[in-house]
């Protein structure tokens, strides 16, 4: 066995010391063979952060790394691989059946293998690259083998700089098809280099961009990768490519289409190549390897176009044809390795497909649709929301009308004037917020009207913040009335302070949020006219003030209850009952008025999937302001006198 290894080392021109260590490792592996399972760790799992390493199964190299989570070992990465120069090119496999316990030696040999595979490939079949296909296709799709093939495809794409023919593209696609198989998706999770799937996408696109078409049409079809290419002239009346592929062996076919309009083709000075590559499983592979919380819901279409073509249309059939979740057209950001909704615009969408208009460039060359993970759509919730908004708007209009009718009667004292000033402004701002919310809901959907959406979102943000800050002003006013005598400050000073808090603070917050996030297109959500969360966390500009005000209002309610309880101490039973009723009235009024019910609104932000939170918030939101007018005895008496 030793002479064979020495012969191998001489063939690869490896250092003598490496060969000696390699031979020693081989001898040790023959002396000691264990029968323990290779996918389970033997170490003690004690959650101290120390990983566990296990050796690979026989006839493979590398190791498996485990991490302790919840007192159980979970596999994190795996570098086990069987592919090497000899297994791929059907040479003496015994030369690479070495099992080494030294991870440094394995890593060194792993990189030397990749170089040797590439060198041997260029020596044996440089014209069509076909001599590696059989060896790769019969190899198991373990994580280490996937990494070897990805690196090989990357090396090929960087080595061959021009004049890629159809035969080479056919072989290259066959290699990629093996690791794009739907059965290999779970193994991508354990590849040591998390960017391997990104490297694969970039390598395939780079290699295909060097394709030179002798004929006017190229059609290279495999199960998990399909390439179409043609030559298009400037005067062509549009062009489209249609792909139809299965996600796995049992699924129905899913289609994807690339359309080039005649108007766009007029921008190109002469004949040019158009190449498009479709991947049915690459979206799931990107999700698995990068561990992203996104779901690709269509084919991934990669395009190679001249720079003059600035806009293309793409039609994606949905893999999961659900009407409850919206889809978002996206492009793959090649530098940041993520899906970016700024590359595309959703033109039309239904339960079966989405139509996208995208802007290909050097950063965005691959496109697909994502299923929105947070958009909760339910007919029941929609009805409750709009019915609740209708009730709220009607109540607010009635409340404002009553305030106008009886204003002179209920504002005779300073405290009454300030209290009703807060009530009127809360009603007015909430009315405007509800109205702009309805406008924003009509502008949302598959087709986002960006400028209109920005305006609607700004006003919704501003007026809902104004509601909160006027609630804060009312809470501070109540607190001020309990602790301090009102006539210590002039009335004009108090009014100016209330307006500064109620309108000044939210206006500053809304303007700063817009100015900071909109230049980078991070102000809006991709699927709705509301503040962005995933990219810029602009939603915090609403959640943080709202949460802070809710806490302040809770403290205020507590202090009001304590104060009224103290007033009831020492009185007769009748007075105690009246005090308890008064406390209940305070809670009934202050809870909706001071925004405590908006805690459920924040809960809908934290847990967007909970239908119960959305329904409770919608119902409670309909009760804003109107309870205060309903239980105010002074207001009822004035209305009775006015109507009577």
UniProtKB/Swiss-Prot annotation:
One of its GO terms (biological process) is cell surface receptor signaling pathway. It is found in: Membrane. Keywords: Disulfide bond, Glycoprotein, Membrane, Signal, Transmembrane, Transmembrane helix. Residues 329-377 are annotated as: GPS. InterPro entries: Adhesion_GPCR, GAIN_B, GAIN_dom_sf, GPCR_2-like_7TM, GPCR_2_secretin-like, GPS. Residues 1-18 form the signal peptide. The keyword Membrane applies. Residues 19-386, 444-465, 515-541, 607-610 are extracellular. Pfam families: 7tm_2, GPS. SMART domains: GPS (SM00303). Disulfide bonds join 329-356, 344-358. The chain crosses the membrane at residues 387-407, 423-443, 466-486, 494-514, 542-562, 586-606, 611-631. Glycans are attached at residues 155, 219, 293, 311. GO terms for molecular function: G protein-coupled receptor activity. Residues 233-377 form the GAIN-B domain. Disruption phenotype: No visible phenotype. The keyword Plastid does not apply. Residues 408-422, 487-493, 563-585 are cytoplasmic. Most adhesion GPCRs undergo autoproteolysis at the GPS domain. ADGRF2 is not autoproteolyzed at the GPS motif because of the lack of a consensus catalytic triad sequence within GPS region of the GAIN-B domain. Belongs to the G-protein coupled receptor 2 family. Adhesion G-protein coupled receptor (ADGR) subfamily. Orphan receptor. This is Adhesion G-protein coupled receptor F2. The gene is Adgrf2.
């Amino acid at each position: 066995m030793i002479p064979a290894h020495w012969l191998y080392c001489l063939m690869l021109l490896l250092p003598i010391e490496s060969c000696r260590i390699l031979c020693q490792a081989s001898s040790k592996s023959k002396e000691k063979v264990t029968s323990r399972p290779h996918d389970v760790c033997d170490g003690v799992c004690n959650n101290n952060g120390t990983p566990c390493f296990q050796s690979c199964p026989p006839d493979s190299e590398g190791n498996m790394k485990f991490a302790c989570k919840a007192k159980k070992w979970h596999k994190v990465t795996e570098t086990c691989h069987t592919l090497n120069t000899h297994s791929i090119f059907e040479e003496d496999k015994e030369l690479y059946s070495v099992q080494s316990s030294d991870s440094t030696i394995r890593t060194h040999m792993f990189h030397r293998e990749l170089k040797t595979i590439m060198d041997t490939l260029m020596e044996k079949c440089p014209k069509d690259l076909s001599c590696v296909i059989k060896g790769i296709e019969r190899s198991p799709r373990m994580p280490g083998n996937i990494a070897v093939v990805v690196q090989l495809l990357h090396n090929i794409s960087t080595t061959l700089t021009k004049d890629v023919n159809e035969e080479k593209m056919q072989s290259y696609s066959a290699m990629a098809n093996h690791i794009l198989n739907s059965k290999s998706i779970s193994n991508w999770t354990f590849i040591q280099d998390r960017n391997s799937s990104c490297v694969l996408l970039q390598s395939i696109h780079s290699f295909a961009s060097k394709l030179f078409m002798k004929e006017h049409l190229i059609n290279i079809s495999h199960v998990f990768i399909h390439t179409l290419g043609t030559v298009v002239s400037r005067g062509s009346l549009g062009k489209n490519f249609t792909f139809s592929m299965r996600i796995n062996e049992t699924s129905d076919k899913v289609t994807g289409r690339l359309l080039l309009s005649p108007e766009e083709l007029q921008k190109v000075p002469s004949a040019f190549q158009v190449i498009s590559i479709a991947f049915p499983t690459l979206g799931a592979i990107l999700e698995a390897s990068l561990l992203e919380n996104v779901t690709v819901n269509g084919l991934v279409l990669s395009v190679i176009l001249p720079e003059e073509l600035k806009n293309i249309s793409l039609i994606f059939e949905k893999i999961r044809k659900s009407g409850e979740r919206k889809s978002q057209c996206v492009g793959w950001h090649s530098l940041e390795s993520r899906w970016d909704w700024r590359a595309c615009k959703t033109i039309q969408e239904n339960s079966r497909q989405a139509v996208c208009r995208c802007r290909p460039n050097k950063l965005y060359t691959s496109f697909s649709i994502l299923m929105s993970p947070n958009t909760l759509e339910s007919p029941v919730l929609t009805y409750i929301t709009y019915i609740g908004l209708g009730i709220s708007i009607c109540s607010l209009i009635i409340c404002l009308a009553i305030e106008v009718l009886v204003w002179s009667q209920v504002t005779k004292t300073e405290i009454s004037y300030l209290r009703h000033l807060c009530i009127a402004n809360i009603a007015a701002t909430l009315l405007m917020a509800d109205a702009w919310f309805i406008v924003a809901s009509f502008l949302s959907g598959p087709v986002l009207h960006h400028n209109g959406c920005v305006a609607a979102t700004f006003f919704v943000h501003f007026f809902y913040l104004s509601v909160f800050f006027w609630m804060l002003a009312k809470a501070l006013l109540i607190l001020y009335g309990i602790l301090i005598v009102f006539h210590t400050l002039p009335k004009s000073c108090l009014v100016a302070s209330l307006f500064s808090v109620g309108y000044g603070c939210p206006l500053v917050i809304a303007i700063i949020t817009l100015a900071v996030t909109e230049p980078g297109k991070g102000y809006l959500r991709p699927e709705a006219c509301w503040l962005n969360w995933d990219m810029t966390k602009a939603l915090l500009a609403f959640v943080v003030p709202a949460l802070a005000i809710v806490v302040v209002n809770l403290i205020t309610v507590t202090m009001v209850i304590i104060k009224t309880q103290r007033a009831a101490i020492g009185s007769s039973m009748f007075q105690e009952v009246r005090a308890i009723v008064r406390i209940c009235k305070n809670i009934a009024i202050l809870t909706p008025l001071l925004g405590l019910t908006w805690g459920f609104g924040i809960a809908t932000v934290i847990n967007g999937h909970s239908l119960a939170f959305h329904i409770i918030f919608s119902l409670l939101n309909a009760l804003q302001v109107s309870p205060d007018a309903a239980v105010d005895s002074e207001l009822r008496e004035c209305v009775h006198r006015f109507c009577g």
